[in-house]
Amino acid sequence: RPHAGVKVVSVSASELMELYRIREVMEGLAARQAAERMTDQEIADLQATLDTHERMIDEAQGQAYYQAEGDYDFHHRIATGSRNTKLAQMLLGDLYYMVRMYRYRLSTSTGRPQRALGEHRRIVEAIAQRDGELAEFLMKRHINAARQNIERKIEEGELTI
């Protein structure tokens, strides 16, 4: 049977916004736990990843950040670094891929890749300082900014769900 086991999941705009609100809390928790549990080497690797992302943005005038899975890599490393297996499974499962699909379609938003990189750097600084509370706050604000960006795109008709 062709496509056996392949499931296509679609969501309404309101469901997508609900998923972002759930992600905001879950990714905030992942960032808090990453600050408490990541090794120094993992944090150094995360910082190096952002340096690579910055070069990619510069080379592509900001358009390649998500296309090269840079954003996914950042969030994946933090989810894994939280050492919370269930949380990481939830964040990196089917729903996460669906959310990524919409994020990818929005990655060409003017200035968003540069802003996202700055937000990522501040999150990593908080993790490196082992400040779980600040890392959680910054991650939640980062996901909330992404949600607001998507909401605006839907309202302006630039993104159809």
Residue positions per predicted region:
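C-terminal effector-binding regulatory domain of bacterial HTH transcription factors
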Residues: E133-I161
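Short linear motifs at protein or domain termini
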Residues: R1-R37, Q41, D45, E151-I161
